[in-house]
A protein has these predicted regions:
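Phosphate/pyrophosphate-binding catalytic cores of soluble transferases and nucleic-acid-acting enzymes
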Residues: 1-317
Length: 317
């Protein structure tokens, strides 16, 4: 029987402080970081994705950041393929791969090798839903999803066209709710010696951090970033533009909303996103939770995480 390879995952709600902690953890473990963020794969989208800069990486290698143009599509199946490739390359160098990010389903596909089948798509259903989106609008499709799969709908922002369409397409093609499929995926055993950490903090503290982050993004030039993307021809229906902070600002650029209203909407959407993230992670069987307020610093949290990784290694030897 082959010995399982160590894999560390660090996740949690947006703005909880995963980036700083991931650097401390990577240095302690001798690791390399793989971004598990569905938006940070895109170039030219730095401010709205809170993307780490080269200087902030502090010499720690990072993977799956700035690998696609914003016009390109990206999904969980593609992420799984690229992440597994990065994991194998990192392990071959004798380093520890550390998956870091808040896109729960992306993490799940790698941690538990969720199977995909490209042949499972029903092109007729896909085409019909695409036509309905153009004719009826995404709100109508979201209402239908809420009726047939309320658990899935509760985990998806009503404006996230890609995920609404995917969940509804899955149901119409298979007759099965995607929420049930995701629940079954949670019962799979990981092929890795897995340490799965969730960083959280008190809700009001998290909301204050979210509001401060959004304010900082607008000061740093988020409006100009979105305007530049629109000017290069990136449509608001692109996968990249479904990210929070991007699709809201298209209303401002189109003259449908003032800037203050858009900013407040970004704050609210980000808080709702954080709540959905936490709901997802609470369902994860192997997740180990860390409350920021219980520790004095990132270094203290990283030290405890390192202790648990090493303990798990000892137990499996």
């Amino acid at each position: 029987m082959c010995e399982k390879q160590t894999l560390v995952a660090l996740t949690g709600p947006t703005a909880a402080g995963k980036t700083a902690l991931s650097l401390a953890l990577a240095k302690a473990l001798g690791g390399e970081i793989i971004s598990a963020d569905s938006m940070q794969v895109y170039r030219h989208m730095d401010i709205g994705t809170a993307k780490i800069t080269a200087a902030e990486m502090q010499g720690v290698p990072h993977h799956l950041i700035d690998i696609l143009e914003p016009e390109e599509n990206f999904d969980a199946m593609r992420f799984q393929k690229l992440a597994k490739q990065a994991i194998e390359e990192i392990q071959a160098r004798g380093k520890v791969p550390i998956l870091v990010g808040g896109t729960g389903f992306y993490l799940q596909t790698v941690l538990y090798e969720v199977p995909f089948s490209e042949e499972s798509r029903d092109e007729a259903v896909h085409a019909a839903l695409t036509e309905r989106r153009a004719r009826e609008g995404i709100a109508s499709l979201y209402a239908e999803l809420s009726a047939v799969d309320p658990d899935a709908a509760a985990q998806i922002h009503p404006n996230n066209e890609k995920r609404v369409l995917r969940a509804l397409e899955y149901f119409l093609s298979s007759g099965e709710r995607i929420s049930r499929h995701n629940a079954e995926a949670r019962e799979r055993q990981s092929p890795y010696e897995l340490s799965y950490f969730v960083l959280n903090m008190e809700r009001q503290s998290l909301y204050r951090r979210i509001d401060a982050r959004v304010e900082a993004m607008f000061r740093a030039g988020l409006v100009e970033e979105v305007r530049s993307l629109a000017a290069r021809g990136v449509p608001r229906t692109a996968t990249s533009m479904q990210g929070i902070g991007y699709h809201e600002l298209f209303d401002y650029l189109d003259g449908k909303a003032d800037l203050l209203r858009c900013k407040e909407r970004v704050k609210l959407d980000t808080r709702h996103f954080a709540k959905r993230q936490l709901t997802w992670f609470r369902r994860e069987r192997d997740a180990e939770w860390f409350l920021r307020e219980d520790y004095a610093s990132e270094q203290a949290i990283a030290a405890e995480m390192l202790r648990r990784v090493e303990k798990r290694r000892e137990e499996t030897r």
